[in-house]
Swiss-Prot record:
Protein family per UniProt: Belongs to the SNF7 family.
Entry keyword Protein transport: yes
The protein's name in its UniProt record: Charged multivesicular body protein 4c
Function summary: Probable core component of the endosomal sorting required for transport complex III (ESCRT-III) which is involved in multivesicular bodies (MVBs) formation and sorting of endosomal cargo proteins into MVBs. MVBs contain intraluminal vesicles (ILVs) that are generated by invagination and scission from the limiting membrane of the endosome and mostly are delivered to lysosomes enabling degradation of membrane proteins, such as stimulated growth factor receptors, lysosomal enzymes and lipids.
Family annotation (Gene3D superfamilies): 6.10.250.1710, ESAT-6-like
Gene name of the record: chmp4c
Length: 227
């Protein structure tokens, strides 16, 4: 067997083993990403302190030692470049971590929904739609029977069923009319005098006085009729 054949066989075997091997879980990947974020955050804080230190060095030397001041500023620029790269890397890792967290959340949600669907299916396996319809029909019938029983119990027995209310009202009106006619018949009107009174001419009264006398006479007649 040649070395080339052995190489292809070994590579094929490693390929099959790599296919059988599963990738990292979502929890493992998230753990690694958080570790990387923590490491880069510490590096970020270190670079920020170094930049402040180099800036202070450049200010310290100023015009007195331009060479040292320029050297400090060059270091500061290199550190700022590294800091910018770390900021970009952190943004990428943060985006990847959030996407992985969302993917893991969606996976768990779908898994739980699948469990719920299976449980619902298992619960409905022993249910027959025809039996459910029959059961609901029986329930409605029993509710109707219960309502009829309640109506029968709450209905008064022996009161109001054998009498017509309209006839009773008509009879009551007749009684009231008879009572009113009896009262009108018993009214004592004043008797008319049989002898003629002497025709003495009374002085004429003013129109207002005659009107007042007529009103008083009407009131007296009305009072006598009422008694």
């Amino acid at each position: 067997m040649s070395k080339i054949t052995k190489l292809f066989k070994s590579s094929g075997g490693s390929g099959s083993s790599s296919k059988n091997r599963k990738g990292p879980s979502a929890q493992e990947a998230l753990f690694k990403l958080r570790e990387t974020e923590e490491m880069l955050t510490k590096k970020q804080e270190y670079l920020e302190k170094k930049i402040e230190l180099e800036l202070a060095t450049a200010k310290k030397h100023g015009t007195k030692n331009k060479r040292a001041a320029l050297q400090a500023l060059k270091k500061k620029k290199r550190l700022e470049k590294q800091l910018a790269q770390i900021d970009g890397t952190l943004s990428t890792i943060e985006f990847q971590r959030e996407a992985l967290e969302n993917s893991h959340t969606n996976t768990e949600v779908l898994k739980n929904m699948g469990y719920a669907a299976k449980a619902m299916k298992a619960a409905h396996e022993n249910m027959d739609l025809e039996k459910i319809d029959d059961l609901m029909q029986d329930i409605h019938e029993q509710q109707d029977v219960a309502q009829e029983i309640s109506d029968a119990i709450s209905r008064p027995v022996g009161f109001g069923d054998e009498f017509d209310e309209d006839e009773l009202l008509e009879e009551l009106e007749e009684l009231e009319q008879e009572d009113l006619n009896s009262q009108m018949a018993n009214v004592n009107l004043p008797s008319v005098p049989s002898s003629k009174l002497p025709s003495t001419k009374l002085p004429s009264r003013p129109a207002s006085s005659r009107k007042k006398v007529e009103d008083d006479d009407d009131m007296q007649m009305l009072a006598a009729w009422a008694t």
